[in-house]
Amino acid sequence: MGCNQSKSANDVRGNKVNNVNSKKKNNKREDINDGEEIAINPGMYVRKKEGKIGESYFKVRKLGSGAYGEVLLCKEKNGHSEKAIKVIKKSQFDKGRYNDDNKNIEKFHEEIYNEISLLKSLDHPNIIKLFDVFEDKKYFYLVTEFYEGGELFEQIINRHKFDECDAANIMKQILSGICYLHKHNIVHRDIKPENILLENKNSLLNIKIVDFGLSSFFSKDYKLRDRLGTAYYIAPEVLKKKYNEKCDVWSCGVIMYILLCGYPPFGGQNDQDIIKKVEKGKYYFDFNDWKNISDEAKELIKLMLTYDYNKRCTAEEALNSRWIKKYANNINKSDQKTLCGALSNMRKFEGSQKLAQAAILFIGSKLTTLEERKELTDIFKKLDKNGDGQLDKKELIEGYNVLRNFKNELGELKNVEEEVDNILKEVDFDKNGYIEYSEFISVCMDKQILFSEERLRRAFNLFDTDKSGKITKEELANVIIRGFYFFTYSLFGLTSVSEKTWNDVLGEADQNKDNMIDFDEFVSMMHKICDNKPF
């Protein structure tokens, strides 16, 4: 379930956990005490919930089961949305991975906490979204988004093989997610079609990487040494217990091979037979099965299935291969209206109010549905040219240029670069120099959808922790700081940010100057951040 690492890798984790949200090299560390700058991110809202899970959700049906427990489809009691809840038995540890029985349960629980900490840090359109965590005497409960489309594995069984366009769109999404993980120093270690879910059965354009139970933080200075994974997809260096993050790239190469011809490159009657073939690393492109497949596809497979992982391509290189660029979807004229609306909403957004930032990010990342996010998610992925799950300045400028080519109605912009700089200043909530997926969704979505009374009330209640109908600076500090420190640190770290800073945050919305924010003031603040700039 978790990451049973060597000592050296565990040492690395201590340095990586606090930096897991630093999105690209040379980014400054996310730190709420850095120059009194409060950085806002969606991981703040994933927390260990108090009370019994049955008070918040009721069971609809069982979705599946595994070695560590089961996955249930549940519905919110106070809402309408469905969630998938992973139920993990605290007593279900893998005894084969530990020698000292007295340490088994403690080690297993540590792995669960590691998985939770890892999941809460991730913000990518092709990676599963974690909402809440519950815990009782017998179980851990991980509340995640529900994807009704089932496993990619089922699609492979039903369709046997895919044409190159469909295969490229699938691989682009998988590689984008893997590229994002690797840039955050995370290796998945169990990429396979069973761990790729579809949002719905009717489309291959929105898939999700799931099951981070074997995932681990990594460092360029240390090699991973645990033999983990699934026979068909495991990399040869993992069998030798000396590997790095490129083991995920090998697994992607195996998946791509299967998508295009319908069978794996390394087959066998049982796991032992398969592993023997993986150890040799020899595979073939049978002429009859591959004669109509492009040379670009075969070349990419060769790069991903390079036996020597030091010479194997990276996930980013695979994502930017000729095959992906040629066969996967790009922005077209049908996307013009959505893209124009997205850029318009970003231009109008005023992001100086920290409480408003936190509230809109909570609504956009935690309360919106897959269907509501669908069009914007597609646009985000198409704007994200390098596929790293973030929009940089260059990609935003290219988005404007695409609209210019379509003779859009966005209006004449004299200085696109200056416009993009302003957008980054306002929309980059976590201050890392890029626009993340949830930041994009939250700011770009139609505010009539985003700001329903129910959603505004739920956002207000998030901060009004004592349910008094007023938000105080103590409640703000509790929610913000508690969001940064999960399972590890004190929930009451008011000294981490100065009293003046909290007063300033409160004062941004406190119209009657009573040092508290009521619901009407909260609603007024939310509308102002989106309406105070002319379009």
UniProtKB/Swiss-Prot annotation:
Q: Where is the lipid attached (S-palmitoyl cysteine)?
A: C3
Motif mapping: J domain autoinhibitory motif: 345-352
What domain of life does the UniProt record list for this protein's source? Eukaryota
> Which SUPFAM superfamilies does the annotation name?
EF-hand, Protein kinase-like (PK-like)
Please describe the post-translational modifications of this protein. Answer: Myristoylated. Myristoylation and palmitoylation are required for the localization to the parasitophorous vacuole membrane.
Q: State the InterPro entries in the record.
A: CDPK_Ser/Thr_kinases (IPR050205), EF-hand-dom_pair (IPR011992), EF_Hand_1_Ca_BS (IPR018247), EF_hand_dom (IPR002048), Kinase-like_dom_sf (IPR011009), Prot_kinase_dom (IPR000719), Protein_kinase_ATP_BS (IPR017441), Ser/Thr_kinase_AS (IPR008271)
Activity regulation information from UniProt:
Activated by calcium. Upon calcium binding to the EF-hand domains, the C-terminus of the junction domain (J domain) undergoes a conformational change which results in the dissociation of the pseudo-substrate inhibitory motif from the catalytic domain. This, in turn may facilitate the autophosphorylation of the activation loop at Thr-230, which leads to the kinase activation.
Which sites carry lipid of kind N-myristoyl glycine?
Answer: G2
Q: Which cofactor does it need?
A: Mg(2+)
The catalytic site is made up of D190 (proton acceptor)
Q: For binding ATP, which residues are annotated in this chain's numbering? A: L63, G64, S65, G66, A67, Y68, G69, E70, V71, K86
Short sequence motif J domain interacts with the EF-hand domains: positions: 353-363
Q: Name one GO cellular component term.
A: cytoplasm
Which EC class is this protein assigned? transferase
The residues listed in the UniProt record as binding Ca(2+) 3, with positions renumbered to this chain, are D464, D466, S468, K470, E475
Known role: Calcium-dependent protein kinase which acts as a sensor and effector of intracellular Ca(2+) levels probably in part downstream of cGMP-activated PKG kinase. During the liver stage, involved in sporozoite motility and thus in sporozoite invasion of host hepatocytes, probably together with CDPK4 and CDPK5. In the mosquito midgut and during the last stage of male gamete exflagellation, may play a role in the rupture of the host erythrocyte membrane.
Per UniProt, subunit arrangement is: Monomer.
Protein name listed in UniProt: Calcium-dependent protein kinase 1
Q: Which organism is it from?
A: Plasmodium yoelii yoelii
